[in-house]
Amino acid sequence: MITVETIRERHSVREYDGKPLARAEFDALGAVVEEFARESGLGIQLVGDNPEVFNVIARFGLIRGCRTHVAFVVDGGKARCVAADEAIGYWGQKIVLAAQDMGFNTCWCALCSRKKSRAVVAPGKKIRLIIAVGHGKTQGFPRKTKSVETLSSVECAKALAWFAAAMEAAQLAPTAMNNQNFKITLLSDAKTVRIDAPQSGLNVIDEGIVRCNFEIAANEAGADWRWERDI
């Protein structure tokens, strides 16, 4: 079961053991991916034994020793779909946390060789990004984050305990280049929550990831709350 503790334990991992997932592991994770694909309506696929997708030339951000990934397949037009990006972040983070619960390590990867993925990509479609999945050489490490005060604001009389707990989870959400370009506001009714983020680049995917973490913690705290705008 995905909990706030799952969020705390999960860290990005870039170095893996170089081994493919065992068949039972792959099938179990594949069932989770298929379930979330059905619920979300997104094109999500688990792809095994495909290390070539991580072969890129870059000075940083490389994934080593990973053979399995989750691919997000979207419409192939040049125009970026904001709604799809936000959903990719939200549902992708659900997969990341479910994988953590199952004993896997993960890393969000915008930097990859998309054309080398063995995902099934129909004409007119493309891979938006992937998530590396496997057994890491380490469990990853905590990264530096912005303060909760920087990432949030409160318009009601006082901050509530559930909001503080949810903001801690949001603070731990992985974002591109660790930029954390978002702000979450508890509105004056002490129930409605607004999230603001730039609508460019990978920021909208990041917004979806943050939403997922915040939602898990707020619901675990038993809060009576709602988003100002649903996905």
Map each language-model feature to its residues:
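Acidic, surface-exposed loops and disordered segments
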Residues: M1-I231
